[in-house]
């Protein structure tokens, strides 16, 4: 969960609010005036649906008017905030992505960037022969820390790893190893909006409810003081 201000919560509760996005690429900030479209896909589960034992990546499709050269495989940091009637909330991180492909329109020179989050950095074989292989079996907590370091990301402090061990991985990729560790905990690894590696377990999901709720805020719909059931 993101820590948000009272203003953000107030704006979110108003169905008339708007969402504003910005992107920071190579030190340059792109606001709504430069961004034509933005789409992020992916989440807690793989495309096949509800599952555990995954290391799930998100994808970004961003179309913008470039302010200058954009480096290949450059980093894109997305942010969002809520606005309404001259009021604006704080900017919240909305993902960190790395450019995979680009396409420029011949006439408008608009640039469409496609990228993935840092999870794709885990596609490399885990054991690097130039580094100390460590002792096996290895504690899963140690394994996660080492893989995160190889990926160049931090481990989210909310990640809780049980005192299990992982066997020698042979030629498994880091992503496959993360999937094995995630399965042992009944969850999936993801990259958070802040760019950290997080083990999200089914135990961390919100409690199921049969209340009829508002699509925007998730609040229960009341008839007088009675909550409606579905």
Listing of model-derived features with the role each one plays in the protein:
Residues 47-49, 121-144, 155-180, 203-211:
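Short acidic/polar beta-strand-loop edge motifs in secreted extracellular
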Residues 109-111, 195-198:
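Hydrophobic residues embedded in beta-strands of well-ordered beta-sheets
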Residues 1-134, 178-186, 212, 217-219, ...:
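Assembly/oligomerization scaffold segments
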Residues 176-188, 196-197, 201-203:
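Internal metal/ion-chelating core segments
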Residues 205, 220-221:
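A compositionally biased, intrinsically disordered/low-complexity signal enriched
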Residues 151-160, 184-196:
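Short, well-structured beta-strand/strand-turn elements
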């Amino acid at each position: 969960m993101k820590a948000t201000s009272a203003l953000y919560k107030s704006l979110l509760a108003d169905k008339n609010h708007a969402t504003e996005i910005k992107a920071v690429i190579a030190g340059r900030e792109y606001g709504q005036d430069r961004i034509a479209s933005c789409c992020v896909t992916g989440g807690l589960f793989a495309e096949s649906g509800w599952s555990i034992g995954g290391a799930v990546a998100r994808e970004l499709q961003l179309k913008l008017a470039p302010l200058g050269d954009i480096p290949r495989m450059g980093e894109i940091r997305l942010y969002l905030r809520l606005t309404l009637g001259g009021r604006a909330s704080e900017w919240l991180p909305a993902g960190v992505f790395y450019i995979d492909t680009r396409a420029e329109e011949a006439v408008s020179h608009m640039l469409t960037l496609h990228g993935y989050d840092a999870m794709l950095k885990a596609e490399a074989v885990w054991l690097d022969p130039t580094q100390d292989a460590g002792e096996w079996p290895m504690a899963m907590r140690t394994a996660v820390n080492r893989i995160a370091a190889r990926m160049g990301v931090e481990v989210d402090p909310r990640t809780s790893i049980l005192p299990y061990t992982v066997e020698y991985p042979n030629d498994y990729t880091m992503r496959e190893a993360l999937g094995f560790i995630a399965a042992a905990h009944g969850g999936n690894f993801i990259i958070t909006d802040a760019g950290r590696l997080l083990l999200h377990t089914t135990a961390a999901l919100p409690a199921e409810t049969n209340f009829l709720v508002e699509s925007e805020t998730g609040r229960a719909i009341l008839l007088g003081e009675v909550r409606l059931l579905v």
